């Protein structure tokens, strides 16, 4: 395991009524994370999310050293589904008029049906190969980008 400020941690954001149930899973490395990713009940969580509306299942890995996150959510239905992959990172926004420059949490999102592409994104993320990760993203469908919402409240499961 990587320790201190160089560690990776991850959590499961489960489909639930409030859409806020987060199960912190603790520290991880690439091999252990990929096992958890493969064993996550994606389709069961997708069905719950579709029943409840306005919620989704998401797995997020945080890199404490770079203050970045890579996450995956599922959308669609059991027979026809895909994934949204998001990369959160600090981005400096230039000020306009009298506003100063500021750093925000930014997210870029991509869509894919190919789990092997997602696995490769996580491999590059754990290696901290950001250039390689961006190149891998460019092979996916660009879904959008925006300032990320910071959630201060995480109920524990």
Residue spans of the language-model regions?
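Negatively charged, low-complexity tracts enriched in Asp/Glu with abundant Ser/Thr
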Residues: 2-67
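Intrinsically disordered, low-complexity regulatory segments enriched in Ser/Thr/Pro
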Residues: 3-24, 66-113, 120
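Aromatic/basic-lined ligand-recognition segments
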Residues: 3-6, 153-157
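Ampiphathic alpha-helical segments that act as solvent-exposed interaction surfaces
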Residues: 26-38, 100-138
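Generic hydrophobic, helix-prone segments enriched in Leu/Val/Ile
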Residues: 30-39, 72, 85, 153-154
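Residue-level signal for secondary-structure boundary elements
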Residues: 42-45, 49, 130-134, 145
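Short alpha-helix boundary/capping elements
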Residues: 63-68, 130, 146
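Short, highly charged C-terminal tails/helix-capping segments
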Residues: 134-155
């Amino acid at each position: 395991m990587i320790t201190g400020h160089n560690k990776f941690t991850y959590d499961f954001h489960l489909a639930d009524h409030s859409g806020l149930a987060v199960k912190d899973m603790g520290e991880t490395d690439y091999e252990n994370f990929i096992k958890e990713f493969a064993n996550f009940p994606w389709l069961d969580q997708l069905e719950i999310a579709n029943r409840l509306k306005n919620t989704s299942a998401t797995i997020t890995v945080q890199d404490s050293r770079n203050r970045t996150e890579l996450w995956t959510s599922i959308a669609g239905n059991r027979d026809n589904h895909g994934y949204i992959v998001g990369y959160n990172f600090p981005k400096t926004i230039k000020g306009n008029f009298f506003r100063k420059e500021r750093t925000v949490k930014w997210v870029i999102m991509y869509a894919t049906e190919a789990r092997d592409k997602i696995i490769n994104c996580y491999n590059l993320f754990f290696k901290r190969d950001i250039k390689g990760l961006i190149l891998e993203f460019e092979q996916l469908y660009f879904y959008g980008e925006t300032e990320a919402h910071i959630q201060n409240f995480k109920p524990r499961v």
